[in-house]
Every structure is written in C-alpha cells, then in structure tokens.
Amino acid sequence: MSDHAALHYCPDLLNFSRRITREVRVGNIGIGGNNPIRVQSMITSDTRDTPACVAEVLALADAGCEIVRITAQTKIYAANLENIAREVRSAGCTVPLVADIHFKPDAAMEAAKWVEKVRVNPGNYVDKKKFEIREYSDSQYEAELERIREQFVPLVHLCKDLGRAMRIGTNHGSLSDRIMNRYGDTPLGMCESALEFARIARDHDYHNFVFSMKASNPKVMIEAYRLLVARLDAEGSDWNYPIHLGVTEAGDGEDGRIKSAIGIGSLLADGIGDTIRVSLTEDAIHEIPVAKALVSSCRVSRQAVQAASRSLSDDAANIQIGWDKVNKDDATFLPHWKIDSGTYAVSFRQADSLPTVVLNRYREARDLILEKIEILTKLDSSRSQLDDLSSLREELNHLETSIIEPALNQGYGSCLFNNNQNAELVANALKHFDGTRYDLLAWCIMPNHVHVILKLAKGEELDKILHSWKSFTSHEINKLNGTSGSIWQKESYDHLIRDGKDFRNQIDYVLNNPTKAGFSNWQWTGCAYPELLARRQNHGLPRDAAATFTPSYNPFSYERRHSKPLSIQGHELGGEKTVRVFTTQSNWNALAHKISQMGDFKPEVIYEKSGAIEIDPRDASAISALNDRTEPTMITVADHVEMEPIHAFRMLAFQANPIHPILLKDTLQPPSEESDFLTSLLTAAKNIGSLLCDGIGDAVLIRGETAPGQSLRIAYNILQAAGTRIFKTDYVACPSCGRTLFNLQSTTQKIRAATGHLKGVRIAIMGCIVNGPGEMADADFGYVGGAPGKINLYVGKTAVKFNIPEDEAVSRLIDLIKEHDQWIDAPTISVSAD
C-alpha cells in the first residue's frame, strides 16, 4: 500500500453515496451542493472570431450544455470575451461562460471582467515547464510560492469582488518543474499543485472555486481525483469544494467515449463529481449527448443529489408541528394523526409474526387507551386536550416498544426476510417513490417486520403509500416463492414525529433495531444522512469498508489482484496472464464462420461452458464454501443481484480468496431486447473499466450490447483503454480549442488511417504545447502543433523534428517510426468482427 493508505476517498465502497460539497455559483447556476451533475463543453473557434464563437456557444446551449468554456491565450484574446458575452446575452442565452487560461495572469485579469468563471492551470499560471532537473531547498521552494502569490492574489481579489467563480484545474501533462522535482510526475504532484493555489485563495477568504485533476490516462486520472478528495476530507469539513471531472486528450469515436466513461464514470459511481466535460476530438456539440448519457448511466438520481446535501441537524430543526393543523383521524385499529408533508415513523409486520397470546394482550391494552382517546376527541379542541391526547399517544407508543417489539425480536413465524430475495423486494418497494411521493429518511427490514421513517410530499397520504408497499410486495413475494395468501398483518403503526428530539430518537431506534435484536452486520438498513451512513453497516461489511476491512486493491496506486492462473478452453487466465474475452454461446455461434480469420481480435471463451461459479456476494454461506476451495476457480457475480456491478464485484473481490480469478460482467441484468448502443458502450466501459483500473478482473463479458460484433469490439476497446490488454495502436488526442494550430479532427483521422495497425505503439496528437508534450505521458511518438501550419515531432517527450510543414507531417511521422524500428506494413486483408 502507498503512503496514502490511511486516507479514505469514499464513505461507502459498496453503495452509491454522493460526496457532500458546498455550492459554487457560476452565473445563474450552481455547481455542487443540492444541484444535479452539470454538463459542460468548450468551443473550438478562434476567440477573436466573435460570430463563430457566439454561434458555437448558442449551439452548445441548445444541445443542453450548461457551462461553456472559451480559451483566452493572451490579454488581447481575453478582451474579446466582452463582445462574445454581450452577443450571447443579446441572443437571450444565459449559459455561463468560462475563460480558459494558461501562462498569462494578465489574460485572466482581463477575462474575469467579462465571464462568469475563470479556469487557471496551477502548472503554468506562473511557473514554467522546461523539463529542468534541480533540487529546491525549503527556502527556495517557499520563495517560488511567494512569487505565485504575487501573481495569483490579484485574480482572487478580482473574482471575489465581481462574484466570479474559478476552477483550479491541474493537468497531468503540465505540472511545473518545481512540482515535478519535489513530487514527481504523480497524482500526488497534481494534488499538491492544486492545493497550493487553493490555500492562497482561502487565505483571502475566497471559496467560490472548484477543482479538477485531468489526465489522458484513466488510471492516473482516477487515482488523482481519489487522492484529491481524500486530501480535501483530511484537511477538514470546510474543504468541501465541488469537483470537475474529465479525461483530457481522450480522443475520438468509441475510443474517446470509452476512455471518458472509464475515468468519469468510475468516479461518478463513487459519488465524486459535480460537473463533467467529455473531451472528444470531434465537434464540441457531439460531447453533450455523451456527457448526458454518462451521467444517466451512473444513476445519479434527484434523491441522491438531495441526500448528498441532506443534514440530520437541519431536518431535525425543521420539524415543528403546528398542532392546530393536525387532523386527528379515527381508524380501524389506531388513531392516525395527519399533517400535510408530515414526517412519520411507520412499522408494519408479517401476518404470522406474533403469537396469538401476545396479540391478545396488546389489543386488550390498546383498546382501553382507544376508549379514552375516543372520549377526548369528542370534546372541544384545547391545548390541554391536545396534551392529554399526546400523553395517550405516548402510552400507545409504549405498547409497541414494551409488548410488540420484544415479541417480534424473538423471530416468531416464517421470518420471510431472512431470505435476501424477499428482503430485497421490500427494500426496492420502499425506495421506488423516494424523492417523488416521499423522502425515505431511514428504514430497517427485520426478519418479520419493517420500520420506516419518511417525510411525505405535499398532498400525499400515508395510508395510500403503505397500501402500495404492502400490495406490491405481497404479490411479488408470493410470485417469487410460489405461495399465496396474506403476507402482512392488516394492522400497522404510525407515529407523527413532533419535533427534532423525537426525530433523532426515532432515527436512532430504527437504525439500531438489528443490534438490539442481537444481529451483527445486518444488511437491510438504510439512511439518507451521510454522517450516519458512514457509520452504518450494509451488505454484511462496514459501510466505510476501508476503516475495518482492507480492500483487495489500493485505490491510490494500481496493482493487479493476485489470483492464481488456470486454463479454460485452452486459454490461460488469472495471475499475470492476459485478461481474456468471454462471449455467450449465441454470440459465438453468430461469429463462428469467421473466428479463424480474426487474429487477436476474437472471442476466446464461451461463458456457458467455462465452468464459472456464479455467486451472490451478499451470501455468506456461498462465500464461505468458495473460500474452502484450495484450487483456483473462475468466479463471477450471479445475474439479477440487485447491486450496481461495480459494487457487487468489489464486494466479491473483498471477500473471496484472491486465488480465484474473477470474470467481470458489464451488467447483472442482461437485456431481453436490443439496447441503445451509446448507453451500452458507456455503461460497459464504466462498470468493467473501473474495476480493471483497480486491478480487479481476469476476464470480461459484455452482454449489455446485444450485437455480437459490437459487443466483442467494446470488450477489446475497454481492455485497451484501461491499459490492460493492447491489441492496436493507442492514441492520445486532444479535443481542440481556439489554441489549436491545425485541424485536429482530420489530422487524427489521417494518422489513424496510416498507423492504426501498429499494435502496441502509442501516438500523441496535440494541437499546441499547453498539455503536449507533458500530456503525451508514455506515448512513443508525438505530433504537436508548434506554429500555424507547422508541426513538431517527438520521440517520447523529446522534440526531434521541428517546423515541419503540415502537409508533410504525417509521412514524416511514419519515417520517424521506421527510424526507431517500430513500423510494420499494414496487412493486406483485414476481417472485421462486425
């Protein structure tokens, strides 16, 4: 494990829980806090061309882009932002504009006058990158920081005075020599670079900023963002700044979309990220549907957004019952006190959950109290009458806790919810209308009864909601188990929560009910409050899994899981062996006529014949039986497990003996009909790519995309993008902006056409020197704009050919590859998997 092993970037590695952040205002919209994930992009037009810039901004806004960035190379370019902003506003468009600044503090000062947000790059705002190797003493290092303060503080004051936002955006490829020499070309260096600027901003009481940690390598990007969030959390609760996500230089086509989904999707799945930009080497407008689909595929729901900013203290303080507005209803079994949008504690139980003797004792005591309540309700309303009614209501509460609860906890009756599938049906029913008809604040499903705390939406009625829960679950549980008859008792108990103290007591009662009943690590509880969520237990493991349980991977440094190799259908996998591509029998049959001609790009193992053991990772007995095996066995998560695949496979990896290789699936709910290709692509890349980047996975199976050829192509492209298995040329291509010195899209296509057969060769295509050569990472060769119409060629990060005319540059790149003995002629016949 690294030096960061004690840090935690996520409160729950097995469930989605959105990171709590403050809101940062950017013009008329908010980022973070209680806001949805914002989608943004960047125009590619020359910033001096006002009509072109305005047209591109308006087109992006019409496509659903919520924030638009524009480059400002110099103060002259930045000054034209005034004209662009004026024309955009004159067109009735209110989308916030952001100036992208590198190298020029004076350009930032000018831009802040006209746009709602300024992006600064800590690596080059003041520092310069000359790839110099030198040692900095502490005093020299502090002197450099003072130089940064002198240049950066004026911008901080201006943004504060004008109400502008800021992004402190580190790029892996543009770390300064100062940072590189002290921290290396590492995620730690990226974090320190940004934190230096943040500390300066905070010293001047400026907090309206967000962070980003972009890299072209998804592994580096994921590690950097995780480390940043962990460092922010370690700094203190007031370092809760929003996060801007992006994989820079992702490229185009499927490759660009897959790289973006692996990086951005992995972090969104862990609740990290408040705004995203998908950087494609295509027209900017094509980024928007990808970003929207990516957010949608990560299921960042409205209630999840609300839960991220939900505070137990705030909700408790807001419960103040106006007793004159309480409607006191007589009901068949209990009096129900109702108030619009009230907060209730509700309990309901299985039909056979209580012995007759207990029910009779309860009903006798209850009926005596009801007689007194009936007499009081016939009197004219008064404060004393309400006090008396409250006292009687407390007596009813006492009957629940003194008679009913102890009997329930004895486990009488069929205890249907000891069965995970039955309990899961109830949990899904409770969550179904969360955020629409009610807010689900806390819940607990015990073996034979259920506790819920919820706040009703305006106009909703508790009895109708309770009926829908009981009706749906009765039908589904009977259907699942092949049974019939009543599942629930007609009686239920509800308590109108009257104030903050009562609310806290009820929350505590529900969440601690399993412990009081003698259960440890009971999985069927939930809570809307992150501060409690981090301390609860779920799925049989602590929610803060890293606190008492060592994951099978280091989230801040890649290391492959140490499984043992085995052979399946003639292919070795596991250990350090190649990650294999599985396919279904039906897809194999569809491709069988050309498999022999596919070379490296082909299906390898038939899933149905692989002998892989399917496991529900929540099933302790199944895990125990697996771990009793002494020989490596292929394992995977069973279909229809109601967990997100990332969480389910993590849970499997956490618990299974590491000798067993793991087969990753993109979905646990295989589609029954043709699916949307973009959604399938992004979901597969997020689910499988995230796990591969954490070293989990020895084989992959794609089923979300039903077309045989396309599913196969997705599998291989994910392996390539995750750096797990290289089968073709790899490209690092920036998305273009107003700085770009040549046509990136057409040039990228030309280079692909000429070099796409060079398996294992990595080529960087950079529009200018802002990120390249730094962002070329471990590229073998680089094609970088040096001046208008002129190209510089690189070997690694070293420029070797300068000022080559653009029309000669691709052929000169090929010559350079040949000089370094990495060229082979393209095959004359190429068979596609489609």
Which residues make up each language-model segment?
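Active-site mouth loops of central-metabolism enzymes
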Residues: 34-52, 71-73, 96-104, 178-191, ...
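Hydrophobic faces of well-ordered beta-strands that scaffold small-molecule active sites
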Residues: 37-43, 66-70, 95-101, 118-120, ...
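Short catalytic/metal-binding and nucleic-acid-binding patches
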Residues: 303-546
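N-terminal active-site wall of soluble small-molecule enzyme domains
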Residues: 72-114, 589-590
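Catalytic alpha/beta core domains of metabolic enzymes, predominantly
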Residues: 136-152, 157, 178-302, 549-557, ...
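Hydrophobic or amphipathic alpha-helical targeting/insertion segments
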Residues: 94-132, 141-158, 163
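N-terminal amphipathic alpha-helix/helix-capping segment at the start of soluble metabolic enzymes
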Residues: 2-41, 156, 160-162, 547-591, ...
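Glycine-rich, proline-tolerant flexible connector loops at the mouths of alpha/beta enzymes
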Residues: 44, 62-88, 122-143, 209-218, ...
